[in-house]
């Protein structure tokens, strides 16, 4: 199993979990520049992996918006290069897409894969373009449209700003959080994603919604998660932001019925938070 992006938020956890279960080759940018096709081909030719979990990416959506050429080189061309090299050695590819492909859709309710994505951001457009390019190279490759993910704030592995980190920081520092009331999205425990990747090896090729469902607004989600964490009076320091997304609510909430039909399921967002906080309950 070759894992790209092995020093990042997701890739580090994938490498940690599957080491010992597979012969893991954990690759970071220092070992392979995915924007350079020949660099990718050399490394794949050396290791000839049976399975590739492609996590390397520019995942900061704001950075991608400010640096569109770099985002395209890494997120689109980089994934295309990995797909080509993987196909050349006969490996099974699982690569990461995003719920951001839906960030321009105006439909309400959880969105299934049958809805045509209409991304309006650089990151979302790049992810959708990546899906098309990979599908043309290797129809058996599996793309996973991930939600925003979190881990416990005390994790020794790399942490990004996420639901639990943001809540703890605001509560401990006594600062205010403004959270959108007109945004709907799933938020998923990264460990739930990691432990379900192995089952994806059996999936037919294509793009799948992959993460926790959630029918609450982002504001409601933050309030309820704060209560689960035992952070007092969340309505006093988590403030509703009704000004974001004025034209229509931003709906990234995904319907995961398709992945569920293959025996892969996730708890909804709040149940996932509860399990993360109280794992033995």
At which residue positions do the language-model features occur?
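N-terminal Rossmann NAD(P)H-binding glycine-rich loop of SDR-like oxidoreductase domains
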Residues: 1-19
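SDR active-site strand-loop-helix element
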Residues: 4, 27, 52-56, 93-99, ...
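Adenosine-cofactor binding site in Rossmann-like domains, unifying the SAM/SAH pocket
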Residues: 19-42
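NAD(P)H-binding glycine-rich loop region in Rossmannoid oxidoreductase-like domains
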Residues: 34-74, 85-88
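Catalytic helix-loop patch of NAD(P)-dependent Rossmann-fold dehydrogenases
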Residues: 73, 77-81, 101-144, 149-150, ...
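Mid/C-terminal beta-alpha module of Rossmann-like enzyme folds, strongest
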Residues: 194-245, 250, 277
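C-terminal amphipathic/interface module of NAD(P)-dependent oxidoreductases
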Residues: 232, 247-281
